[in-house]
Amino acid sequence: MSTVEPNVYDPHQVETSAQQFWDATRAFQVDENSEKPKFYCLSMLPYPSGALHMGHVRNYTISDVVSRYKRMTGHNVLQPMGWDAFGLPAENAAIKNKTAPAKWTYANIAHMRAQLKSLGYAIDWSREFATCTPDYYVHEQRMFTRLMRKGLAYRRNAVVNWDPIDQTVLANEQVIDGRGWRSGAVVEKREIPQWFLRITDYAQELLDGLDQLDGWPDSVKTMQRNWIGRSEGLEIQFDVRDTNGAALDPLRVFTTRPDTLMGVTFVSIAAEHPLALHAAKSNPELAALLETLKHGGVSEAELETQEKRGMATGLTAVHPISGEQVPVWVANFVLMGYGTGAVMAVPGHDQRDFEFANKYGLPIVQVVKLREPRNDDEQRWDATEWRDWYTDKSRELELINSAEFDGLDFGGAFEALAERFERKGQGQRRVNYRLRDWGVSRQRYWGCPIPVIYCPKCGAVPVPEDQLPVVLPENVEFACTGSPIKTDPTWRQTTCPDCGGPAERETDTFDTFMESSWYVARYTSPNAREMVDRRANYWMPADLYVGGIEHAILHLMYFRFYHKLMRDARLVDSDEPVTNLLTQGMVIADTFYRDADNGGKDWINPADVEIQRDERGRVTGAVLIADGQPVHIGGTEKMSKSKNNGVDPQSMVAKYGADTVRLFSMFAAPPEQSLEWNEAGVDGMARFMRRLWAQVHKHVGEGAAVALDVAALSAEQKAIRRKTHETIGKVSDDYGRRHSFNTAIAAVMELSNALAKFDDASDQGRAVRQEALEAMVLLLNPITPHASHALWQVLGRGETLLENVAFPQADVSALVRDALTLAVQINGKLRGTIDVAADAAREQIEALAQAEPNAAKFLDGLSVRKIIIVPGKIVNIVAG
């Protein structure tokens, strides 16, 4: 048993003792040989940046609270930890610090592991891995070669977002306002060879699967549905003529609004479209525009906000119904990577086309009207003023100016046009998706090598499995740009596995989302020779996944897709990787600054600022502690380095102890909401911990408590016991169903306050207090496990792993107020009695009757058909 100074709460001594016990007993190491139901709980694995931030602490504490609670409710719980260790920050740090990325990464992992352990998380460290090690990434290399052979991994030229500073391709989501998310450089368009995974082959399954994810937030599912972007429409062929009237390759366009076809007045194509390149050969002005457009982004979000630009190509498209020739324009809002790189422009019923047509003086024709306009404005159509109803497909519409299609509604026009084009071979019905195939190539060094060899004779050849892993050299000299493996001939040059001739390795590395797309499964099978083994099907799918909503589209989409690839490779049985998803809110804090000489702001850390308040406690200003001079208050924002408003978790642990930091991070806000960091609030949690510590020691110092005799309790004693069991019931629900940890803590605090006012020193008074204190210690254990570990011993229960102690269960009989005694009958025969409140609800009476021990014995194996209650006398359960 650990020893601590009585009545003095020393969190560091308490926490060291508890952590030593957990380490010595390997308390949180689990296996699959358990009769308990499994529960797999994890947080999104961290990038080893060098230090934990408060966002990490909140994320991992949420997971830990749930994990510890589930252990106490009889589950076999897996809570692992690893490191998402590849990525650009390591390369940037290597350049800055003149050290190899591997050395920087492994040092950071060691430091952050120690930080996590100091917070007392119930992690099975035997399953730890870093994704940058060959024994991890060999498995994704092997999977990739198998996907190549199945045609699910392929290489093609693609127009990409190119960051000229970081010398790498960026995903659309990594381009912010036309600039690279890390470097800030203006992003260019480039066409380069890229490796892709065919996520589009799984688009419909990814969409349908969202309907089965009842435990995921609706907001995340909506974001994924929108990103997948399923749409039904027609693909229509437009014949194309050059300036001399000669036929060129036809254009195929996809539209969800074929009813507006007669309103087509031009066709727009992407700057990279073959027809645009063809036209530019004889048009220097067009060629110059195409070169300029290379520097625009390729994300849809950018296209929505940027100025519409374009130029006529001199080519014409033949309208497939009227035969009229309409001009073909290059437009900067058309992407080659989306659809066919061409769209039919209907400026009368598409706002983007409307703006473009008005800018360049192109015709605008109305071909749809509202059948039942709601006002005069909806009866007017103006080619110079956009109105939302022009494109509102949800309203009842009718075609006009559309020849034989006049009078049809949307559905009728769709069917008529589909039948016509399919009969004439000019088009077909088609389902289209906004989702694009996943480009997994990155032109960086610090990533998993793509296991491909290029042979002049054989082409792209997957590295044979017996030659895997392709190991990334870690001891490299790092330059400011590019990749050291590109300039290392000893690594790059090799032989072709097919013909034995000279060949070269692929020098691109995988997008780091590859590693984080399957790591959840790897935790289940540490050290397995394959990617996973049979243990994966014991643990998968994970029961709870905790992480930020900012990962809703990228990580969580790839994560689901890769799991389906593993399923189809017969590595796992489940369709989805995670059953329940909890997206925690941000951690925010006050910001302070002074105006800088360059017109910017010098941000000041809150720890260096003193807040000034008036006599009513209202904030009146702030001063820098160092010089006493005023600083500006900038409001509350997400903790970040840029705003210098972060709080170092280690300094908080050093000052208050891990339990207090954990307690505040769970108390300050519900998990899904933003948490405003406030050290005064941390102070309040520290006071509560000291008060609880003192309550337990004062009680124990007054002598041993006798056994509780419920029948002998006074009204006041019953009231305290009722409060205890009401708290147990609420906290159980808050932990298990609602994940409402702040209200659970508040309930325990209320019980503590009630107990402080209860000064009954009689034997049964002390017995009631003993029960209440034991309950409080156990109820808080998921959040404050170190203090609970110590206080359980102080209460005379010995040193043990509290996660193996059953979570308290509310005694329903203790909840009764002004009890009545009711006879409990099973099919008319007396089987017991229950005490219920005079105003007890029917549901409570029914539950108590069925829970009565003798009645429960007679009900075993029977189905309850109905329950008859004679008020104040009898509960008759009819069962059979």
Curated annotation (Swiss-Prot):
Motif 'KMSKS' region location, chain numbering: 638-642
Keyword Ligase belongs to the record: yes
Organism (species): Xanthomonas oryzae pv. oryzae (strain KACC10331 / KXO85)
Molecular function via GO: aminoacyl-tRNA deacylase activity; ATP binding; leucine-tRNA ligase activity
Keyword Cytoplasm (UniProt): yes
Gene: leuS
Localization terms from the record: Cytoplasm
Family note: Belongs to the class-I aminoacyl-tRNA synthetase family.
HAMAP family, A to Z: Leu_tRNA_synth_B
Protein's name according to its UniProt entry: Leucine--tRNA ligase
Biological processes, Gene Ontology terms: leucyl-tRNA aminoacylation
